[in-house]
Amino acid sequence: MEKLVERFLKYISFETTSDESSDTCPSNPKEFELARYLEKEMKDLGLKDVYLSENCYLYATLPGTDKNKKTIGFISHMDTSPDMSGKNVNPRIIENYDGKDIKLNEEFVTSLKDFSFLKDLKGHDIIVTDGTSLLGADDKAGIAIIMTAIENLMKSNEKYGDIKIAFTPDEEIGRGADLFDVERFAADFAYTVDGGAEGEFEYENFNAASAKISIQGKNVHSGSAKNAMVNSILIAMELNSLLPADQRPEHTEGREGFFHLNDFNGNVEYSQMYYIIRDHSFEKFEEKKKFLEEAVKFLNIKYDNRIKLEIKDQYYNMKEKILPHMEIVDLALESMEKAGVKSEIIATRGGTDGSQLSYKGLPCPNLFTGGYNYHGRYELVSITTMKKAVKTVENIGKIGVEK
């Protein structure tokens, strides 16, 4: 088995699901298990300055052979999404995929009808799940790509500048860059390897916020509830109905933003709703937050102040921080071309650690991994594309940017 695939399969065997309800960093102590494994692997490879922080940020350096080039960083995250279990991942390799529906198990099928991109993967070697968990390509494919590219550079006779590597916790819950030590990392610029389809390159992302809504009802015996009971579930339903139905993830694409109710729990007495708010336009992002605030205000008048709203900005569109440094965009595009990859600049409908790091003074656009259908049982990754991503990362190091 190729080292790239071997690495990936090993990394996804670690359960590293981040936990939004936790106040610790990392949010799940199991993230340390993968971090310690990677720490040892880095040391065994001979990387320098290997350091694992108390908050599960892992850093390392590949010393350069050309001191006239700027220092480049590569970053991926170790956690997987809490949207689905990342425990006991049972991957299956499909060689020379035929481009048809993929039966995951007796109940679930990754179908061409639902996922038209599958036709583009015909002839690829791919890795899929057994339908009981996510795969973890987001972003353990990125980790495997970086580690393999670094090892290849070390074994080559090529010239490259200093290269920094970092693997972070809790990206999936919007905290991956919170405690990232930009000074320790000491790169002039960096790339997250956390994208999707072959050739996709992203330096524009959503502005993002989370919203937590708490609704206090009044539970009274249903037989004597007239003019007394206040059902918090019904208030929650009413609140959701006030938001634009056409501004939901399932009805939007491209640069269209949305409100997404991604969790709800409640009973008559008490309910909680959790939304994420997204838009590429900062103006429209602010309008969406204001709209939700006004909806809550309206219902608080109607229901005697029973609703509490907490909105927290998570990250912002990195575009304005990348535009002054377009040489790093040009470097990525040239490196893809040399790897035989047709590049496509897209506005990602998500966020990466790089979006926050760009606002901390580390310009950090996003490279592809070959992963698809993140955060669920239909997640898959193309080994064929991962290999091209490895070549792209190697080329970035080799070409570099002169000081």
For each of these PLM feature ranges, what is it?
Residues 23-69, 73-79:
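A non-catalytic alpha/beta surface segment that caps or lines the substrate-entry region
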Residues 2-29, 128, 315, 372-376:
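N-terminal capping segment at the start of a domain
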Residues 234-251, 258-260, 306-307, 316-365:
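Active-site-adjacent substrate-binding region
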Residues 68-159, 187:
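Active-site metal-coordination/substrate-binding segment of hydrolases
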Residues 151-173, 254:
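Short helix-loop-beta-strand segments that form the rim/entrance of peptidase-like active sites
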